[in-house]
Amino acid sequence: MYNFKDSVSITVVSGNGGSGCVSFLREKFNAKGGPDGGNGGSGGSVIFKVRENLRTLSFYKNGHVLCAKNGQPGMGFKRSGANGKDLILFVPPNTDIYNENDGTLLCRLENLNDEFVILKGGRGGLGNWNFKTSVRRAPRFAQPGESGNSLNVRLELFLVADIGLVGLPNAGKSSLLNRITSAKSRVANYPFTTKIPHLGILRYSYDDLIIADIPGIIKGASFGVGLGTKFLKHISKTKILALVIDISEANFLESYNILLNELKTYSYNLFYKKKIIIANKLDLDSSKKNFDCLIKALGKEKIVGISIYENKGIDELIKEFFVLAKTF
């Protein structure tokens, strides 16, 4: 399993400009050829760029200082110093970049090859030949290069999916994701099996949807209990919420209400997103009666009953996903 990281704070530093050169042309038959000091090279800039197939910020470590290269000093014969190499930092799609000092959103990088120059390198200094005049024929000074800049930034990754699977621990979200997509979300019979979000692609006919399995939500998650708000943010950008409920449990309605309350407490926008209720584990003895009670209690909601174990209701659920997605 890869190390999922969706937030990291780093320091970025652009390169210093190279100093201009103080030099005078000295040749065999031209002992006083005049100033010929070249310009310094520009410092490297710091650029964030979206790269395909990146899904995490785990290759960055909190507190790291990442620097672009400095420009090289100018040389004689009016030769300019080499420019410093830019520092290109690759990020996944849907990465927000904040000024860590004041919390300002600097940029939102959403699509492949989007890029943002966050710091420009310092300009190279002018060599002494630039300062020659009719009065000052032999300037013995040059311009220093400009210093680069530094900035503390925070990177925040948002997973974007068409449908987010939301439920209490052990509701069956991971098993459902694995069944309808090619994802390999971890499955086991204990709470919080899913500790990081997993994405899968659901294909039907010539269309596809991105499905996200979000770690289980428990009562108080919106205040940081359990895995807390760490992953609730990832469903804030999904189009549709699929509330997965273990219909075999006696407290299935309480589970449903806990989910709604946590969504509402965390964000009204989440609460009012389009939803579909998935009553899972219909193969168990108590489920049929509970499912009828659920239909009666929540008759106005869109409800689909499924059994992943017996593969019942899966095709109907897939069709409903695509019907709902087309309403956007």
From Swiss-Prot:
Disulfide bonds: none
EC number: 3.6.5.-
Sequence positions that bind Mg(2+): S174, T194
Keywords annotated in UniProt: Cytoplasm, GTP-binding, Hydrolase, Magnesium, Metal-binding, Nucleotide-binding
Residues annotated as binding GTP: 167-174, 192-196, 213-216, 280-283, 307-309
Domain OBG-type G, chain residue ranges per copy: 161-326
GO molecular function, one term: GTPase activity
NCBIfam families xref list: Obg_CgtA, PRK12299.1, small_GTP
Protein name: GTPase Obg
The organism of origin for this protein: Borreliella afzelii (strain PKo) (Borrelia afzelii)
